[in-house]
């Protein structure tokens, strides 16, 4: 992709998000070292959701901060070059979805349909929190010299980043 084409780049962004089964998470920890983890992710009506347990240190850090950095990344087995795996990194604020809401039930059903029967087991566990990610912006990397700035909640492709 040589030209800056926001429409084509948006299609690639949407493909990366649609194929993602998990999202990597990083948040500041208590001792200023980042806490990192990974959790399944689903999309519903254009929004991204995670359902992690607060028993994990990275989830406690995320809940305390109310925001975190996230990344979806191309599967290693599909990458043309391991040094240039396609990835989408973004910062997001978190919105906790109340357990007694229609949204909670609908998203839990999507988790079960997407990721299998484990959701039926953990759905009622009180240490799990349903979180909607509200992106603020980020970067999409599609290969060498193919990094693009993403802006806003829709992660609009706004700029080709040509230098560090």
What would you call each of these model-derived segments?
Residues 32-34, 63, 83-85, 123-126:
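Short coil/turn motifs at beta-sheet boundaries
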Residues 42-45, 88, 124:
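Short glycine-enriched loop/turn motifs at secondary-structure junctions
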Residues 46-47, 66, 127, 136:
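Beta-strand-connecting loop/turn residues
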Residues 53, 73, 143-145:
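Surface loops and adjacent helix of pleckstrin homology
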Residues 2-7, 11, 109-110, 114-164:
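C-terminal edge-of-domain segments
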